[in-house]
Amino acid sequence: MIDLDLEGPGLHVIFGISDAEIKVTINDVLQSAIPIRDAVLDLTSRLGIDSGCLLFCPAGHRLEEILKMVDTGFNLSRFKAVLYSLATEYQLDYLLIDSHPGIEKDTIVSMAVCDVVVLLSRVDHQDMFGSGVMNEVASQLRKPVVLILNMIPSSVGEKESKKIGEKIASLFNLQVLTALPFNSDVFENLSRGVFVLEHQKDPLTRKFTELAENMIGIIDRALEGEESYDHGSTPQTVG
């Protein structure tokens, strides 16, 4: 996983990574000849993951690092080379890039090199408008897009959530994977740990697990060319 939210990095906090542990960031790698392996942190043991592994590349979170990246940016060809090196050296099954919300250069660059674009959005007007714009950008880049609806108000039942998902799927002509309800426990847990690992029996954790399995299936089918999520296809909802 790469934290590419270069203007507001924060994944390192959720993973409990201290400043002292971060020697090299993705910023350093993209703006110099530093190899990507120097920025990789293996979180497998830290998070108690029994099967597989989780590797993480943090973004620079000091003010001078953020300002430098905003001012100079990074080269697309260098970014592609870094991703290729990371994927091949560690024999990755999947590479997740968490980018900045909204239309920023780093966001568009990450969309341009990815295989599948996953949008995460609340159902308020501002987020929906932004998701529509991002969907259009992905269309121009000819990238498959799926949408996850987040923080659905607790007053909205499961059937109503599904109807909302169907309407949005039809409006944007894309696949809505699921509608995640607002959960106060998740909200209170923000920036203090990985919820699904700390609350493994929680119903929402099961929903996240199903979502992850659906996403893996979508990515695999997209790579194999067996299933298309192009913008001219029939919109769908899952979950």
Model-derived features: positions:
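C-terminal lobe/tail of nucleotide-utilizing enzymes
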Residues: S139-G239
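Cytosolic-facing regulatory segments adjacent to core modules
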Residues: R37-A39, R46-L47, S51-P101
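Conserved catalytic-core segment of NTP-binding enzymes
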Residues: R78-A179, E188
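A short acidic, helix-capping loop that chelates divalent metal ions and anchors anionic groups
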Residues: G10, E64-K68, E188
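Residue-level signature of catalytic and energy-coupling elements of molecular machines
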Residues: V29, C57, D98, L180, ...
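Short beta-strand "acidic-cap" motif of Rossmann-like dinucleotide-binding folds
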Residues: M1-D3
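Conserved Rossmann-like nucleotide-cofactor binding loop
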Residues: E7, R62, Q126
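Phosphate-binding loop that captures ATP/GTP phosphates
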Residues: E7-F56
